[in-house]
Amino acid sequence: MPDAVGAIDQGTTSTRFIVFDRRGTILAQAQREHEQIFPRPGWVEHDPREIWRNTHAVMREGLARAGLAPGDLAAIGITNQRETTVLWDRRTGEPLHDAIVWQDTRTDRSVAALARDGGRDRFRAVTGLPLASYFSASKLAWLLDHVDGARAKAEDGTALFGTIDSWLVWNLTGGPDGGLHVTDVTNASRTQLMSLATLDWDEAMLGVFRIPRAVLPTIVSSSAVLGEARDPFPGVPLGGILGDQQAALFGQTCFSAGEAKNTYGTGCFALMNTGPAPVASSAGLITTVAYRLDGRPPAYALEGSIAITGALVQWLRDNLGLIGASSEIEGLARSVEDNGGVYVVPAFSGLYAPHWRDDARGLIIGLTRYANRGHIARACLEATAYQTREVLEAMERDSGCPIAELRCDGGMTVNDLLMQFQADILDRPTLRPKVSETTALGAAYAAGLATGFWKTLEDLRDNWAVDKRWHPHIQAEERRALFAGWSRAVERSFGWVEENA
């Protein structure tokens, strides 16, 4: 009887395969990085063939390290970097171009042209998304318009489009020899081509971006048996797909409305489950699909993205030389009792949710002769917590649903000082789970549910365990004063970049 589930975690910089047991404990993992390709300023690409080769390799390596055979796996789940766009030839399996990565901004001008007629929110009611080069639709349109023969191949069904999950599933299930061309609802919701109401491709959106329907994958549930793998693990069911941030929400077992998680990495991604109906945002958030279990209604989410959090620590290390390693920031920040009145607003390329101010730029404010390296380090950590509070308050305003606690994951959660201050400034507990790989765990859970390895969502809740919990310690007046100072600092960052400068 199979006693493990495997998860492919295909990220922006690397691909991993992680094997979990029935308790959600990691048995083994393998990882390989792939090349970041920068053909021009603002362009970011990946080689889909390299990603597939690495996926194939880490699957074999990870399973071997676990001491298991393919038959020991009940299912395989997939989680992936979202929005990254692949176009390939279904006859040969060869990409028509390198994948255009979610960070790529080559379509900024075409998106701005669309926004001139109706504004950046003109399609938000249908897709939940503002007009942005971030999402897949404009990237696919660029490929169809700039790759020789691509549009003709797309129109006759010879070319296939997909986000990274689609590319992996197609290759895992046979490639040119009958590979499945599918994507799940979470990834489809990030293309700007899917209707949140119907969970199908929207004909009007296809018309706006001039996308032939024949090029698109079939949209499936996030947890459902899609078929069986053929290579490298013949016969093992493919049971689930989730975009990376939705996978983290699922891995954190945020299955009820009002439950939220925040992933602390280079930036932060906060998601809140809003239940079975989409919640429109008037506070600068994105409305998206959280997940859909096979045969059940979908769960929706509000998402807020913060551009610079962990990257601010890297800036202190690499640009200012205040620390020699990122791990040193906690000790430096603890060398002082508070921020000394110093605030750092990390608007290096503007501010994301909930402000969305392209004209903002970074600042350090509140400096006196009293301020020292420790105060600046502490202010950098506190900036992450302040920005998270702004996003969570926007979520509560949009949804009308209070967030009782925040489940935290990602690399920065090892910083106890940050996690304590996060609880203090939110005035609610923050929790770090015992299993830190929540993104891969979410993909494993989705796949295991589909195959009966886990029976119910309650089985998954029973697996979730707290590694550490932080409760608020500061008084309400101190919290109010600290956040008021942050708000004043943020306002002063606005308008630095002049439109015609």
UniProtKB/Swiss-Prot annotation:
Binding site for ADP: T12, R16, T266, G310, G411, N415
The protein's annotated pathway: Polyol metabolism; glycerol degradation via glycerol kinase pathway; sn-glycerol 3-phosphate from glycerol: step 1/1
Binding-site residues, sn-glycerol 3-phosphate: T12, R82, E83, Y134, D244
Keyword terms, alphabetized: ATP-binding, Glycerol metabolism, Kinase, Nucleotide-binding, Transferase
Residues at which glycerol binds: R82, E83, Y134, D244, Q245
InterPro entries found in the cross-reference section: ATPase_NBD (IPR043129), Carb_kinase_FGGY (IPR000577), Carb_kinase_FGGY_CS (IPR018483), FGGY_C (IPR018485), FGGY_N (IPR018484), Glycerol_kin (IPR005999)
GO function term, MF aspect, one: ATP binding
Single Gene Ontology BP annotation: glycerol metabolic process
Reported regulation of activity: Inhibited by fructose 1,6-bisphosphate (FBP).
Keyword ATP-binding (UniProt): yes
Residue numbers binding ATP: T12, T13, S14, T266, G310, Q314, G411
CDD domains: ASKHA_NBD_FGGY_GK (cd07769)
EC number: 2.7.1.30
GO cellular component terms, semicolon-separated: cytosol
Catalytic activity as recorded in UniProt: glycerol + ATP = sn-glycerol 3-phosphate + ADP + H(+)
HAMAP family in UniProt: Glycerol_kin (MF_00186)
Family: Belongs to the FGGY kinase family.
Functional note: Key enzyme in the regulation of glycerol uptake and metabolism. Catalyzes the phosphorylation of glycerol to yield sn-glycerol 3-phosphate.
Protein name per its UniProtKB record: Glycerol kinase
Organism of provenance: Methylorubrum extorquens (strain CM4 / NCIMB 13688) (Methylobacterium extorquens)
